[in-house]
Curated annotation (Swiss-Prot):
InterPro entries: Antenna_a/b (IPR000066), Antenna_beta_CS (IPR023623), Antenna_beta_dom_sf (IPR023624), LHB-1/5 (IPR002362), Light-harvesting_complex (IPR035889). The chain crosses the membrane at residues 21-43. Antenna complexes are light-harvesting systems, which transfer the excitation energy to the reaction centers. One of its GO terms (molecular function) is electron transporter, transferring electrons within the cyclic electron transport pathway of photosynthesis activity. It is a single-pass type II membrane protein. The core complex is formed by different alpha and beta chains, binding bacteriochlorophyll molecules, and arranged most probably in tetrameric structures disposed around the reaction center. The non-pigmented gamma chains may constitute additional components. This is Light-harvesting polypeptide B-885 beta-1 chain. The keyword Transmembrane applies. Its main location: membrane. The keyword Metal-binding applies. It is found in: Cell inner membrane.
Length: 48
Protein backbone atom coordinates (compact mmCIF):
# COMPACT_ATOMS: atom_id res chain seq x y z
CA UNK A 1 0.00 0.00 0.00
CA UNK A 2 1.21 3.48 -0.81
CA UNK A 3 1.95 5.75 2.14
CA UNK A 4 1.98 8.79 -0.13
CA UNK A 5 1.02 12.16 1.36
CA UNK A 6 -2.13 13.84 0.05
CA UNK A 7 -2.74 17.54 -0.55
CA UNK A 8 -3.52 17.97 3.15
CA UNK A 9 -0.20 16.39 4.11
CA UNK A 10 -2.00 13.64 6.03
CA UNK A 11 -1.86 9.94 5.38
CA UNK A 12 -5.14 8.07 4.95
CA UNK A 13 -4.88 6.79 8.55
CA UNK A 14 -4.20 10.28 9.92
CA UNK A 15 -7.10 11.69 7.91
CA UNK A 16 -9.43 9.01 9.29
CA UNK A 17 -8.34 9.79 12.86
CA UNK A 18 -8.74 13.53 12.33
CA UNK A 19 -12.18 13.04 10.78
CA UNK A 20 -13.31 10.94 13.73
CA UNK A 21 -12.08 13.49 16.27
CA UNK A 22 -13.56 16.38 14.28
CA UNK A 23 -16.95 14.64 14.09
CA UNK A 24 -16.90 13.90 17.82
CA UNK A 25 -15.99 17.52 18.57
CA UNK A 26 -18.82 18.88 16.44
CA UNK A 27 -21.28 16.46 18.06
CA UNK A 28 -20.09 17.51 21.54
CA UNK A 29 -20.58 21.21 20.75
CA UNK A 30 -24.02 20.46 19.28
CA UNK A 31 -25.08 18.59 22.43
CA UNK A 32 -23.88 21.47 24.63
CA UNK A 33 -25.87 23.92 22.46
CA UNK A 34 -29.04 21.81 22.67
CA UNK A 35 -28.73 21.52 26.46
CA UNK A 36 -28.12 25.28 26.77
CA UNK A 37 -31.17 26.04 24.63
CA UNK A 38 -33.31 23.64 26.69
CA UNK A 39 -32.21 25.31 29.92
CA UNK A 40 -32.91 28.80 28.56
CA UNK A 41 -36.30 27.61 27.25
CA UNK A 42 -37.16 26.26 30.72
CA UNK A 43 -36.07 29.56 32.28
CA UNK A 44 -37.70 31.94 29.80
CA UNK A 45 -39.64 30.39 26.87
CA UNK A 46 -39.72 32.13 23.53
CA UNK A 47 -42.16 31.78 20.58
CA UNK A 48 -45.29 31.37 22.65
Amino acid sequence: AEDRKSLSGLTEQEAQEFGTLYTQGVAFVAVIAVVAHALVWAWRPWLQ
